């Protein structure tokens, strides 16, 4: 069985083709599309990465390029299109309408369009990708896999905001959470590493990248997560502010008239804040760490603020879960920054979290434990694999 995973952004289409018998990647790549500087970068299991300039201005053209490439007699990975059994689409926001992965139907597409207003940066692009795939691959079923779906098990007291109730009823304003596909994947891997069923475990998973979220999981179900109605809430991130006093927004609008424009205000909090905002240097943790070691005070402050915000969520979720069995670090920073992991875990021995400095500093891209022998909580580094999780969800959805 072959599954084609598609992730449509506002100006790009990423794809991965899986052979599900052994869950191996056959081909993968990205088409960056636009009026200028568009390119196609691709790789297969038997060939090196190649990058070419292309003239692609739409999702439809990008999908057409990908399919033609997969079918190419010389460099392709399949002989005919019928080898693809199902297409899995990554969808960032499913609102409270979609609590699980679903096969694409007219009704599902109608429901997805209703989510445009709560995720205007992502959902229209996802929808365009679905239409492009339907045009190029008629007859092959598509499945939508939602980043928000894994978090739909949160109890109402965890997802509710203390606003007038009508804002929830009429406008569906509530906590949704994101990175669900990643949190789902690493929690399953953690159970395997610990040699136990997910139903026996209490876990905290930390997806730390340019965007970051922390999730509390009990018996395989999400109890709480740090991101909210949008991915802006929660811990300090690369360019996102995370949790702030909402009254600050009204104050900023008052002192800076340009922020009366909602797009400018949104850009301030999403693209100009976080590590970048505090340091004035970069939203990239690698640059921040380098500058901090060179005695840049703002970089050091940005680093410490981010790590402190993550530590607060971990400590809070430990209390909510009444103890945990494992703490998982994943995604770009979580997997690759030992200095961040150590800063977060230091002085958490009171709640059973003790990191082994030597293990933590070992360079490796594999799943591994980095806790001390005496740590009550097992600390794990687990590389995420959202594409594989989408492929699994698509396969399982097709079979049910």
From Swiss-Prot:
Substrate binds at residue 90. Mg(2+). Can also accept Mn(2+). The active site is at residue 147. It catalyses: acetate + ATP = acetyl phosphate + ADP. The record marks 179, 240 as: Transition state stabilizer. ATP binds at residues 14, 207-211, 284-286, 332-336. GO terms for molecular function: acetate kinase activity; ATP binding; magnesium ion binding. It is an enzyme of class 2 (transferase). Mg(2+) binds at residues 7, 386. Catalyzes the formation of acetyl phosphate from acetate and ATP. Can also catalyze the reverse reaction. Homodimer. HAMAP family: Acetate_kinase. This is Acetate kinase. It comes from Endomicrobium trichonymphae. The gene is ackA.
């Amino acid at each position: 069985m072959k599954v084609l995973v598609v992730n449509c952004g506002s100006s790009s289409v990423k794809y991965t083709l899986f052979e599900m018998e052994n869950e191996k990647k056959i081909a993968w790549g990205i088409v960056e599309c636009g009026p200028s500087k568009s390119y196609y970068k691709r790789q297969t299991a038997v060939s090196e990465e190649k990058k070419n300039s292309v003239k692609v201005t739409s999702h439809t053209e990008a999908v057409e390029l990908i399919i033609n490439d997969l079918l190419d007699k010389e460099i392709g990975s399949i002989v005919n299109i019928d080898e693809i059994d199902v297409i899995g689409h990554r969808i960032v926001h499913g609102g409270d309408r979609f609590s699980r992965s679903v096969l694409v139907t007219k009704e599902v597409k109608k429901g997805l369009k209703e989510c445009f207003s709560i995720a205007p940066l992502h959902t229209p692009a996802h929808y365009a990708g679905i239409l492009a795939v339907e045009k190029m691959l008629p007859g092959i079923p598509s499945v939508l896999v939602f980043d928000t779906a894994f978090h739909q098990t949160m109890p109402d007291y965890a997802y509710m905001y203390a606003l007038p109730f009508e804002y929830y009823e009429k406008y569906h304003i509530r906590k949704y959470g994101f990175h669900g596909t990643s949190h789902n994947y690493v929690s399953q891997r953690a159970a395997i590493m610990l040699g136990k069923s997910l139903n026996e475990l209490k876990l905290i998973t930390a997806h730390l990248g340019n965007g970051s979220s922390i999730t509390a999981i009990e018996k395989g179900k999400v109890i709480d997560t740090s991101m909210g109605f949008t991915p802006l809430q929660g811990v300090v991130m690369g360019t996102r502010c995370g949790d702030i006093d909402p009254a600050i927004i009204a104050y900023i609008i008052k002192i800076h008239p340009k922020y009366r424009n909602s797009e400018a205000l949104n850009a301030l909090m999403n693209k100009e804040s976080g590590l970048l905002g505090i340091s004035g240097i970069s939203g990239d943790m690698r640059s921040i760490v380098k500058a901090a070691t060179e005695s840049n005070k703002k970089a050091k402050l940005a680093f410490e603020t981010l790590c402190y915000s993550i530590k607060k969520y971990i400590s809070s979720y430990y209390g909510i879960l009444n103890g945990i069995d494992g703490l998982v670090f994943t995604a770009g920073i979580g997997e690759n920054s030992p200095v961040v992991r150590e800063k977060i875990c230091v002085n958490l021995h009171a709640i059973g979290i003790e990191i082994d400095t030597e293990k933590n500093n070992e360079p490796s891209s594999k799943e591994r434990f980095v806790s001390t022998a005496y740590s009550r909580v097992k600390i794990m580094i687990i590389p995420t694999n959202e594409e594989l999780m989408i492929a699994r969800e698509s396969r399982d959805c097709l079979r049910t």
